[in-house]
């Protein structure tokens, strides 16, 4: 489960940001998870709830925003948001497409409680 190592890195980032902003706690953590990121949201949530104990994010709520796959066709130029996980252009049927979004995971925002 690579979600554990992802959460450990996420918590390090959260701790650093909280320290830089003199926050006594973090109340909300918002992450964006692309459907092709390889991250399983339920496993990420479980890992977050396990590892946040004893950190500045101990009482934080984790909000996960799932980002759909978005592609651009290199033949016809059409940009498409895909419901299914395939790279076929719905405009011309080409497989000559490029991923625009939906393959990353990143920290989107934090809600901090400061002194």
UniProtKB/Swiss-Prot annotation:
The keyword Metal-binding applies. PANTHER family: HYDROGENASE MATURATION FACTOR HYPA (PTHR34535:SF3). This is Hydrogenase maturation factor HypA. It comes from the Bacteria. GO terms for molecular function: nickel cation binding; zinc ion binding. Pfam families: HypA. Keywords: Metal-binding, Nickel, Zinc. GO terms for biological process: protein maturation; protein modification process. Ni(2+) binds at residue 2. Zn(2+) binds at residues 73, 76, 89, 92. Involved in the maturation of [NiFe] hydrogenases. Required for nickel insertion into the metal center of the hydrogenase. Gene3D superfamilies: 3.30.2320.80. The keyword Metal-binding applies. Belongs to the HypA/HybF family. It comes from Aquifex aeolicus (strain VF5).
């Amino acid at each position: 489960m690579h979600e554990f190592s992802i959460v450990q890195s996420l918590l390090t980032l959260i701790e650093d940001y909280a320290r830089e902003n003199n926050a006594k706690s973090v109340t909300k953590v918002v992450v964006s998870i692309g459907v092709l990121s390889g991250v399983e949201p339920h496993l990420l949530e479980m890992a977050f709830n396990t590892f946040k104990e004893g950190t500045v994010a101990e009482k934080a709520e984790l909000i996960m925003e799932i980002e759909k796959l978005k592609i651009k066709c290199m033949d016809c130029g059409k940009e498409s948001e895909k419901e299914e996980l395939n790279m076929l252009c719905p405009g011309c049927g080409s497989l000559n497409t490029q991923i625009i979004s939906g393959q990353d995971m990143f920290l989107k925002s934090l809600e901090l409680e400061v002194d």
